[in-house]
UniProtKB/Swiss-Prot annotation:
Residues of the Chitin-binding type-2 domain: 21-78, 135-192, 244-301, 306-361, 400-456, 469-524
Residues glycosylated per entry: S103, S119, S208, S212, N355, N497
InterPro entries per record: Chitin-bd_dom, Chitin-bd_dom_sf, Chitin_bind-dev_reg
Gene3D superfamilies: Chitin binding domain, Glycosidases
Spans annotated as Disordered: 78-134, 196-248, 361-399
Deleted gene: phenotype: Worms lacking cpg-2 and cpg-1 exhibit defects in cytokinesis during embryo development more specifically meiotic chromosome segregation, polar-body extrusion, osmotic barrier function and polarization. Embryos lacking cpg-2 and cpg-1 proteins have multiple nuclei lacking plasma membranes and may also have weak egg shells. Oocytes lacking cpg-2 and cpg-1 show cortical granules that are reduced in size.
One record GO biological process: eggshell formation
Signal sequence segment: 1-18
Residue stretches of biased makeup (Low complexity): 382-392
Name recorded for this polypeptide: Chondroitin proteoglycan-2
Disulfide bonds: C54-C67, C168-C181, C277-C290, C337-C350, C432-C445, C500-C514
Any Pfam family the entry gives: CBM_14
Amino acid sequence: MKTVAALTLLAFATAANGQFLQDCTNALDGLYALGECEPQFLTCSGGIARIMDCPADLIYNEPLLICDWRHNVIGCEGSGESSGETSGEGSGESSGEASGEGSGEASGEGSGEASGEGSGEASGEGSGSGEETVENVCENLEDGAYSSGGCTTYYFFCTTNTARFLSCPTPLFYDADSQKCIWKSLVEECKEDLTITDGSGETSGEGSGEASGEASGEGSGEASGESSGQGSGEASGEGSGELEPTCEGKADGIHPNGVCSTNFLTCSGGIARIMDCPASLVFNPTILVCDWPRDVAECAGLPTPQPTCEEDGYFSFGQCSSSFTACTNGRAIVMFCPAGLKFSESTVRCDYESNVSECQETSGEESGEASGEQSGEGSGEASGEASGESSGEGSGVEEQNQCVGLDNGLHAIGCSPRVLSCQNGHVDIFECPSSLVFNDQSLICDYPQTSLKCLIEDTILIDETPIAAFDCSTDGLFSDGLCSATYHQCTAGQLINFTCAASNAVFSAANTECVDSSTLLQCH
C-alpha cells in the first residue's frame, strides 16, 4: 500500500510540474506519459525503461493509465484529424490540391464547401458543431449507455450530463436493447438494412470529396487534383488506378468492392474502409463473408488472383530497418519491431542494432549490451518482452509441436495476446499490444469481446453483462486489462487507481486481489 501511495504522489508531482519522464531514473515501477496527446508511453520495471506504442489511432490517457480515443482525453479533443486536415472554409474552396478534399474541388460538384458541410471535418463550422453535440447530447438523459441512432457502430455514455463517445470493434454493431456490441444480423435496427448492394457504381464526382478526405486522405486528393480536371477523386492514394468506392447512399455495414474481389467495403457513419480477405479467399456478396473462389458465383470463369508473396517467410524492408514483411500463403503483412529494435533477416527476429549484421556496415557501432532475446530463448519470456516475439528455439519439444497439424499462417493461442506463426515447421510467437488478443477469424489483434475463443474459454474475464460507464456507480475492484498489474477501485462514486506491488503480480478479477501472473492462464 505504501508503494501505491508513493506512486500516486509521484504522479501528482509530475503533473504539477508540467514535466514528463524520459527515463526511469529514480522512478517507481509503473506507466508514465511521454507528453500530451502522445501515441506512446513509458513503462518502468526494475529501473529499465521501455517505450510502448498504443494501437493505431489511440493516444495514451494518463489519468486512466490506458490507450484511449483522442476525444476521450481532456485537452486532446481538437488536436487530431479534424484540426490537421483542412482548417477553415477557404481551404476547401481555393487550395483543393493541398487537402484531402481536393478531388471534390476538381470535379466542380463535390467542392470544398460541399465536403465541408457533409463530412464535418473540412471546415471550422463542422468541427464547431461537433463540439456542441458533445456538450448537449446528454442533456436531460439519465446516466448510462445510449445508441447514436439507427443501425450504427457508434454509442455513447452519459455521466452527469457529460458524453463519452465510443465505437464498436469492426465488424460489430451496437444493440440498444442489450447495450452490447454484437453481430449486425442480431441488431433489430439493422435487419432492414441487410440487403445486398453493388459496390461498383459509386464513381461520381459528388462523393469524391468525402472518399478522398476520409478513406484515403493521405494522398488521393492530391493525386486526383493533379492528374485529372474531371474530378477523378476516387483514385486511391496507392496509385492503383482503380476507383475508390464511397459509402454515399449505402447503409452502415459490409458491401462488395467489385466482382470476385479479394477485399470488401465497410461503411460506418459514412466513412469508407477497404478490408482484405484472408489469403486465397474472395468476398462472397451473397452471404457477405470471405469465401473460397469456387463457391462464389461471380468468380466462375475468371482467372485466379496471383499471390503478392511468392515465398512464405519474413523479409526485411531494407538494410537495418525496423519494418519487415511477413508472407503467409501468398499474402503480405507489414509488421514492425518494438521501439529501439531492428529486424535481422538472417536470424528472422527483432534484435538490438548492435546484434543485427545488416546494421554493422552503416552504423559501425559495437555495444556490450547483452541481447535480451539470447538469454530468453530457453524461457520464451525475455524474447517476448524485448522483440515482441518468442523464437521457440531451445524451448523444448512441446513448443516445436505446436504447429503439428496446422497450416502455414497465424494462429491464436487460446484467449491470449500471443500469436503462433507456423512456416513450414518453423515456430515463431508474436504478441499483440496490451489489452488486445489475437482473433484467428479476422487475423488481427482485437478486443477480447470479438474473439470466439475468449467467449468460450474465459467466462470470468469476458463479461457478457450490459456495458457500464466508467462512472463508478457500482462499488468494487475492477481490472484494467486481461493480464494487467493495474486496477481501480470504485467507492461512493469515486475512482482510485492502484498498481500491484510485486513485479510479477497481476490483478485477478475473480479473486479481487493481486496474484502471481503464472497462476493465470491469460498471462501465459
